[in-house]
């Protein structure tokens, strides 16, 4: 498994992050098999959130991993906080309480990475800064980042927060690629030219934030998986063609498409199927050509100006 430096930090992480949002759909035996398959593949970066399964996913993960100090040393744990029923909450009290809850459920005394999950309209950045300081000084969190945030929101936090922000988790896939396509539609009058995220892709590259694409196989906002979908026949044909060339699965090609981007992204898997997880990890070994990358992008209905 190839690795990258997370943001501007010295933390080496695998290029594939293992998402644990659906871990509560597995029984104990399957959860154990899933976690240990990931570790065997070199995908030791596990991605959580306090709300996944109402907290159960973190508990299931710790039990499945057989969490101990020696096991903990073999993995990198990231969790997110800031979502409550009916609201978002970046208050100092909520951030601190959320981290304590995650640590208890994960049976560990520290998180390698903490992300703020979704932008809080009532954010008081001074409170975020105070929470981050306490978490860093206590050793409970080693690195910090954000999720689903645009450049101005990040700049507001950076004005007050002392710690470097190392990651931004964003929805991105072949069929949800406005973050990419708006860049080459500059100065055009078509809908693809609409900048919906403040230029977050280039911002993250300029400011050393690793982009972690979530839902890399989805179209729309959890609209469904595009692989095998009759909504994307041309895309599926092209992906299958490239997969055959490299002797890999369609799943591998989808992840390789994201890894081909020079922003050095870290896609987050969502599957609970060990076979598909292995296919995702194989993308680390596949380097698409420029021609293949663009052909896949265009086959999804994206158009060059």
Over which residues does each language-model region extend?
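Acidic-and-aromatic substrate-binding clefts and catalytic sites of carbohydrate-active enzymes
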Residues: 23-29, 49-59, 84-89, 120-124, ...
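Conserved beta-strand positions
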Residues: 18, 48, 79, 113-116, ...
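Active-site groove signature of glycoside hydrolases
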Residues: 103-124
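N-terminal binding-site loop/beta-alpha segment at the start of enzyme catalytic domains
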Residues: 1-75, 137, 219-220
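Beta/alpha (TIM)-barrel catalytic core signal, keyed to glycine-rich beta->alpha loops juxtaposed to Asp/Glu
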Residues: 125-305
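A structural motif
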Residues: 43, 108-111, 141, 165
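Structural motif corresponding to the early beta-alpha repeats
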Residues: 71-93, 117-118
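Short, acidic/polar
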Residues: 26-38, 90-105, 152-155
């Amino acid at each position: 498994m190839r690795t990258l430096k997370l943001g501007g930090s010295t933390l080496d992480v695998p290029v594939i992050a293992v998402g644990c949002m659906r871990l509560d759909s597995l029984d104990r035996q399957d959860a154990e098999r899933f976690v240990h398959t990931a570790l065997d593949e070199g995908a030791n970066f596990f991605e959580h959130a306090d709300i996944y399964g109402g907290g159960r996913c973190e508990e299931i993960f710790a039990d499945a991993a057989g969490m101990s100090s020696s096991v903990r040393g073999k993995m990198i744990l990231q969790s997110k906080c800031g979502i409550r029923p009916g609201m978002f909450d970046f208050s100092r009290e909520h951030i601190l309480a959320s981290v304590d809850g995650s640590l208890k459920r994960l049976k560990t005394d520290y998180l390698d990475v903490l992300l703020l999950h979704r932008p809080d309209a009532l954010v008081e950045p001074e409170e975020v800064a105070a929470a981050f300081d306490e978490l860093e000084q206590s050793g409970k969190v080693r690195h910090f980042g954000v999720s689903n945030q645009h450049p101005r929101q990040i700049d507001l936090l950076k004005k007050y927060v002392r710690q470097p922000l190392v990651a931004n988790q964003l929805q991105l896939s072949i069929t949800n690629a406005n973050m990419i396509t708006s860049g080459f539609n500059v100065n055009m009058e078509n809908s693809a030219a609409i900048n919906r995220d403040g230029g977050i892709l280039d911002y993250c590259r300029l400011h050393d934030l690793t982009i972690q694409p979530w839902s890399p196989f989805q179209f729309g906002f959890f609209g469904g998986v595009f692989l095998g979908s009759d909504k994307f026949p041309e895309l599926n044909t092209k992906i299958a063609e490239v997969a055959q060339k490299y002797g890999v699965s369609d799943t591998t090609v989808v992840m390789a498409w994201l890894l081909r981007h020079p922003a050095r992204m870290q896609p987050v898997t969502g599957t609970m199927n060990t076979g598909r997880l292995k296919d995702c990890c194989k993308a680390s070994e596949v380097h698409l050509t420029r021609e293949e990358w663009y052909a896949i992008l265009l086959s999804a209905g994206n158009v060059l100006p």
